[in-house]
């Protein structure tokens, strides 16, 4: 019975914590949602530009290294 309790007790505790978390969460209103969506979009754009410029810098460097061999 002790082996069963060692498996069931963590699952029961996880379920209890999950229910507590869901009860505390709230649905964002339109203003909060648009703010989060805008910041996420800005993050995607910034990361895209960073990736583009890194690629733009390393393509000529790679051609110099590979082209010299």
UniProtKB/Swiss-Prot annotation:
One of its GO terms (molecular function) is protein transmembrane transporter activity. GO terms for cellular component: Ssh1 translocon complex. Signal peptide: none annotated. GO terms for biological process: post-translational protein targeting to membrane, translocation. The keyword Transport applies. Its main location: endoplasmic reticulum. Residues 1-32 are cytoplasmic. Keywords: Endoplasmic reticulum, Membrane, Protein transport, Translocation, Transmembrane, Transmembrane helix, Transport. The keyword Membrane applies. It comes from the Eukaryota. The chain crosses the membrane at residues 33-61. It holds the Pfam family SecE. Residues 62-69 are extracellular. It is found in: Endoplasmic reticulum membrane. It is a single-pass membrane protein. InterPro entries: Prot_translocase_SecE_dom_sf, Translocase_Sec61-g, Translocase_SecE/Sec61-g. Necessary for protein translocation in the endoplasmic reticulum. HAMAP family: SecE. NCBIfam families: secE_euk_arch (TIGR00327). Belongs to the SecE/SEC61-gamma family. Heterotrimeric complex composed of SEC61-alpha, SEC61-beta and SEC61-gamma. This is Protein transport protein Sec61 subunit gamma. It comes from Oryza sativa subsp. japonica (Rice).
